């Protein structure tokens, strides 16, 4: 790859005051900077304590200096780390000294970008650094660390190797049709293809779970007017986020509240009550509610347990089921259990439907059941040593690869079209390569690394 030769420098610790502050330098001038600031040649990978001096010999600070010659460093280049006191003025003076010695100020994420360009880590691992820093729960941090250590990349690389093997068989059958063994016709290729599809499906499911832990789950509260949707939002948020009255149709727009349950991020959306109406403003609210339902990761379908139609709420709203055809993502909330006399509990039906009876306003009875249920939906405490962190772009790439394999299988089974299957396999491999950076445009790399902290 085209690795830049400029030397870069930046403050690597968070803004503000602290006990320790770190300046990081990477590039061909790092060794020269070390000698100028410390006053002597540093032994590689040893901690050297002493004063940090400016161009006139005046002491700027004192602390520990570490020198890592490339390629045995984080970036793969010569790297210098100066660990001094964490005052912003002191750190800025030390940074200015590095810039005077020929370094330039690093862009956000440029150290990680250079590590990627020097093959010290792949793109998924580089992104995991930012995910680890921004983790909002212990579970998300553990997943990000596993991705940084290569758990996700190994799964993708294994899929890629299987795709390459499959492509070899397909290309051989196309290029040498006169051979006695026809891999396309004897079922060997189809079996290999189905094996890759099954493994890809597993990785996609696990990546989806990892993305929820990283980005948070979008939970939409839906139901008829006056079922207690806004009361449920307030109970989950722990504050009066929505206006609650006895008047049906009080909520006319989509309300969004960001909450955490044991550190797990949730984006809770309260919607207008679903009903036929002639009110233009309320109609817009209903349309927005249906749109939110279609985009949700989890839907809390709230019904008034005291109403006679609460016995079979799904039969009431065909438009609801049209927006969310996957019933596995719907949790039925029987609200107002304090008035109906329903016991506070969580029940799972034979077909997997979960129903929770609670009271959103009566001291939040049953709310803890709902919180635990939402945590379970996000995969809280259900991850294994192989689980990993993932991003939305990773999911898009995995889905693209999956779609290509599905299309290729149809071409093979319906038309025996080996050439078209070969192209679909190529596209699937390229989609997987976008995850680790084997196939990545400069624009994509720029967007990814610009989201990092300066000094990372």
Swiss-Prot record:
Q: Which cofactor does it need?
A: K(+)
Q: How is the cofactor bound, as the UniProt entry phrases it?
A: Binds 1 potassium ion per subunit.
Q: What is its main location?
A: cytoplasm
Q: Keywords for this entry?
A: Cytoplasm, GTP-binding, Hydrolase, Magnesium, Metal-binding, Nucleotide-binding, Potassium, tRNA processing
Family matches, as Pfam families: MMR_HSR1 (PF01926), MnmE_helical (PF12631), TrmE_N (PF10396)
A GO biological process this protein is involved in? tRNA wobble uridine modification
Q: Which residues bind Mg(2+)?
A: 230, 251
Q: Which SUPFAM superfamilies match?
A: P-loop containing nucleoside triphosphate hydrolases (SSF52540), TrmE connector domain (SSF116878)
Chain positions recorded as GTP binding sites: 226-231, 245-251, 270-273, 335-338, 359-361
Enzyme class per UniProt: hydrolase
Q: What is its EC number?
A: 3.6.-.-
Q: Where does K(+) bind?
A: 226, 245, 247, 250
GO terms for MF: GTP binding; GTPase activity; metal ion binding
- Disulfide linkages recorded for this protein, renumbered to the chain, are none
Binding positions for (6S)-5-formyl-5,6,7,8-tetrahydrofolate per the UniProt entry: 24, 81, 120, 456
State the similarity comment: Belongs to the TRAFAC class TrmE-Era-EngA-EngB-Septin-like GTPase superfamily. TrmE GTPase family.
Concerning NCBIfam families, the annotation shows:
mnmE_trmE_thdF, PRK05291.1-3, small_GTP
Protein task? Exhibits a very high intrinsic GTPase hydrolysis rate. Involved in the addition of a carboxymethylaminomethyl (cmnm) group at the wobble position (U34) of certain tRNAs, forming tRNA-cmnm(5)s(2)U34.
In Swiss-Prot or TrEMBL terms, this protein is called: tRNA modification GTPase MnmE
Question: Which gene is this protein's source?
Answer: mnmE
């Amino acid at each position: 790859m085209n690795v830049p030769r400029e030397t870069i420098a930046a403050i690597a610790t968070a803004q503000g005051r602290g006990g320790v502050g770190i300046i990081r330098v990477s590039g061909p001038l790092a060794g020269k900077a070390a000698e100028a600031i410390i006053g002597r040649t540093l032994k590689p990978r040893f901690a050297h304590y002493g004063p940090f001096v400016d161009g006139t010999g005046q002491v700027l600070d004192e602390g520990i200096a570490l020198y890592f010659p490339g390629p045995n460093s984080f970036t793969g280049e010569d790297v210098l780390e100066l660990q001094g006191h964490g005052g912003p003025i002191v750190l800025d003076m030390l940074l200015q000294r590095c810039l005077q010695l020929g370094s330039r100020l690093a862009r956000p994420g440029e150290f990680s970008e250079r590590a990627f360009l020097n093959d010290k880590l792949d793109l998924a691992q580089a992104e995991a650094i930012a995910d680890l820093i921004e983790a909002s729960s212990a579970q998300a941090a553990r997943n990000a660390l596993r991705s940084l250590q290569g758990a996700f990349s190994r799964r993708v690389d294994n899929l890629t190797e299987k795709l390459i093997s499959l492509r070899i068989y397909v290309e051989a059958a196309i290029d040498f049709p006169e051979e006695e063994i026809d891999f396309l016709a004897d079922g060997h290729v189809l079996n290999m293809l189905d094996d890759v599809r099954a493994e890809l499906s597993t990785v996609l499911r696990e990546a989806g779970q990892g993305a929820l832990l990283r980005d948070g789950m979008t939970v939409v509260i839906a139901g008829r007017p006056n079922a207690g949707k806004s009361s449920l939002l307030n109970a989950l948020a722990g504050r009066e986020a929505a206006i609650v009255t006895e008047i049906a149709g009080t909520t006319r727009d989509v309300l969004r509240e960001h909450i955490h349950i044991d550190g797990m991020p949730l984006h809770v959306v309260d919607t207008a009550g679903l009903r036929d109406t002639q009110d233009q403003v309320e109609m817009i609210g209903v349309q927005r509610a249906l749109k939110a339902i279609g985009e949700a990761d989890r839907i809390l379908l709230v019904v008034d347990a005291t109403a006679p139609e609460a016995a079979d709420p799904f039969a009431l709203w065909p438009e609801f089921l049209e927006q969310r055809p996957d019933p596995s993502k719907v949790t039925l909330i029987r609200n107002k259990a304090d008035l109906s006399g329903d016991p506070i509990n969580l029940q799972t039906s034979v077909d997997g439907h979960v129903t929770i009876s609670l009271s959103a306003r009566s001291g939040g009875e049953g709310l803890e059941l709902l919180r635990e249920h939402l945590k379970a939906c996000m995969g809280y405490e259900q991850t294994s040593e192989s689980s990993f962190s993932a991003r939305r772009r990773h999911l898009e790439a995995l889905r693209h690869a999956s779609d290509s394999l599905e299309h290729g299988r149809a071409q093979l089974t319906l038309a025996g079209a080996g050439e078209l299957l070969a192209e679909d396999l190529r596209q699937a491999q390229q989609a997987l390569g976008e995850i680790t950076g084997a196939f990545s445009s400069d624009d994509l790399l720029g967007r990814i690394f610009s989201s990092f902290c300066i000094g990372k």
